[in-house]
Amino acid sequence: KFFKSKWHIEQLHPPQYEAMEAVFSKSNILLAIPTASGKSLVAYIAILNQLLTLNPGSRAVYIVPLKALASEKFEELKEIGAEIGLNIGLGVGDATAEAKNIEDCDILICTSEKLDSLMRTKSELMSNVSVVVADEFHLLHDATRGPTLEINLTRLRTLRPDAQLIALSATVGNCEILATWLD
């Protein structure tokens, strides 16, 4: 209802529709489709499916590479959360009011660097994670950001092996190899 009434989304694009089977079966997903084709919507649906249907009371982690992207996702998810009673937290390394919501949030949007810090200092925050979204997943190959992302995902998979992992990218190469790694 929200997506139709607030964002005027009448139907899913074919790649989004094809991803729904994996979303609802709780499978890990590598969604590699072009920019502005609706990857985030698939991730949002996966998050809502986990938090509202499959694992109420659990937490979602949405990993992004940049503060600007974190702020964008925070605003979008805050709008969704306000409609359905989910609290959204933002972790980008700043001591902002949003950062104070990290411990009480249902959905945590954060940079890889902030997630790394949280897993070292407040690992209990990850104890009830049911879904992890890795946006701009192609940065796994980046010499600067890739190692932190890979370590974070590996740690999360160790801490929460049953958590659903949604990897999003418009430009990732080696899809088959990376999809195998996700599973």
Segments predicted by a language model, with ranges:
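Conserved adenine-nucleotide phosphate-binding loops and their immediately adjacent elements
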Residues: 1-5
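Conserved P-loop/Walker A NTP-binding site and adjacent catalytic elements of P-loop NTPases
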Residues: 6-183
